[in-house]
Amino acid sequence: MIILGPLFPEEREQEIISASKRGVSNAANNFQWNLIKGIHANTDEPLIVINALPVGTWPKNFKTFRLKDTDWSCGNIVGHEVGCWNIPLVKQFIRMRKVRAWLKKYPRESELLIFTAYLPFLWAVNKLKPEYRVTAVITDIPEFYDMHQVSAFRSLLRRIHCKIVYHFMVRVDRFILLTKQMAVPLHVGNRPYLVMEGMCGDVADEPPVSKPQPFSMLYTGRLNRRYGLELLLQAMKELHDPDIELWLCGSGEMEEEIRAYAAQDSRIRFFGFLPHEEAVQLQKKATVLVNPRTNQGEYTKYSFPSKTMEYMASGRPVMMFRLDGIPGEYDPFLTYIPEESAASSRDTAESLRKLSPSELDEMGARGREFVLKNKNRNVQMRRVLDFIHKEQSDA
């Protein structure tokens, strides 16, 4: 199997973070590595990974102009990282050509697995012979990429990008989706697809234990307005208990605004952008984990926040709004905020504050057990491989 993904080897995380001016997506990289390791655990076949670094363009978003070709390995996994001149359009074209060149070195009967609707990858497989079977793992609808970019020019570019992506996506034979609602906007049609909300990876053997003080609420992820952070900050202003703290970790458009809030309220702690492992350790130290994303906007029903799975695996209680993309089987293990308002968020936080440490630990442990048993990467990738093999035998 050949896997195409915009990822970076885990040991290079600090190097990539240091060169990036706007942070990187820990969630996407972690998802891809869970996918790769889950497949590796379920098959004896060799795994080939062709990757491109998920970084912004030079010089505005990344410090390096020329990204080098690099061969790497991780156990029995062989990787080929395609380099490029890191400037718009040229970057995508070079990556497409290099990915296509690598694919032609492998047998035509190879099974290809593409992570996300990344244009250079779809472009590279578009003209491949039918013997190559292509499965696309789609975690986001292309129309909702870069939603924080609101200029007319950026909107025009996004529309053009979507048209090209959907044109090339016709070559995809089957899909892995995070929610069943995604099938319609992706124009899946009669092509087979499997719904896989997400997965969790390696976690510590023992769940964390609550500490009485302070009562800390943690958010880790992108610091963008569409994720409900303004509402969370407003709720914190309405919480007057001096022993309640709000911890924030990540990077994004609201970073400076959050620094200003933290300067005014000592209960708000901003940790900046942390490597994934440090963010996970911080999750285990928090009292509760919060996802303030509301159910507003069409994109919510097309996404299953990977943050939810990661939060639950940490063993801490999870406080969030009910989202259309999250199946009902998760309901017993999540604390839902009844209304999408700062007041309702405040009230939910106060109700959790009244629980004893042992009650909070029990809530977190039940959610942790659920995802570790039913949604771990080995179980989820076994489902994916069974789905692919079934489609192969039916073809």
Label the predicted regions.
Residues 1-64, 234-239:
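N-terminal subdomain of nucleotide-sugar transferases
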Residues 2-4, 176, 208-227, 232-236, ...:
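Conserved donor-binding/catalytic core segment of Leloir-type glycosyltransferases
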Residues 27, 31, 158, 162-206:
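Donor nucleotide-sugar binding/catalytic pocket of nucleotide-sugar-dependent glycosyltransferases
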Residues 33-37, 97-104, 123, 127, ...:
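Membrane-proximal helix-turn-helix segments that form the acceptor-binding/catalytic region
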Residues 256-281, 288:
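Nucleotide-activated donor-binding/catalytic signature segment of Leloir-type glycosyltransferases, i.e.
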Residues 283-301, 316:
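Acidic donor-binding loop of glycosyltransferase active sites
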Residues 343, 354-389:
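A charged, aromatic-enriched C-terminal amphipathic alpha-helix characteristic of glycosyltransferases
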